Amino acid sequence: MPISNFIKRKLAMAFYLFDRDKNGVLEEEDFVQLGAAVANLQGVPAESERYRKIVAAHRGWWDAYFKGGDADGDGKITLEEYVANVDRWAATTPEPIAAAAAGNELVFDTIDANGDGTLSADEFSTYLQAYGLTDADARTAFAHLDRDKSGSISRAEFAKNMAEYYLSESRGPSEWFYGGH
């Protein structure tokens, strides 16, 4: 079954946030720049191992989730290619939300700046500011995504929210992952 317009809108919002140079397509360099922005906003020195890991994780996100959707092999992903790739992946993956949640836990470590296993409002805000959101919008998103209202987002909450953002037809907290739409 093709994905709905609701999910297409969420995918489009994420697509335009990932497009760091605003050229209308996603390329590997967008993810390198995104990783660098996350590290810089966290105050991680550019020559450090943590900086390299953050950039590598975002480059890995390109390799794992985006590169395979390049239908014409030009090294660029259009919005149409992106939506078609997510649709194809969701249709052919058993338990797609659970599978996506498992993969999304890898991103968590790049955001968890203090390594305590949870995301604070400050850490999550810094992450979303790398995408271009304001601190206020990021904190509003955090309030929605902190499902148990503990004041932090656990690894499981993060992975579930991100997976549901991309794949769930249901309205709820996950639609706030990138600041609402």
Each predicted region: which residue ranges?
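Short helix-capping and inter-helix turn/linker motifs at the boundaries of alpha-helical repeat units
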Residues: P2-F6, A56-A57, I97-A99, Y131-L133
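The feature marks the first
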Residues: P2-V44
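Primarily EF-hand calcium-binding motifs
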Residues: K8-N23, R52-D74, A101-G115, D137-R155, ...
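Amphipathic regulatory helices of Ca2+-sensor modules
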Residues: E27-A46, I77-T92, T118-G132, S154-S168
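Conserved GNAT-fold acetyl-CoA-binding loop/helix
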Residues: P45-K53
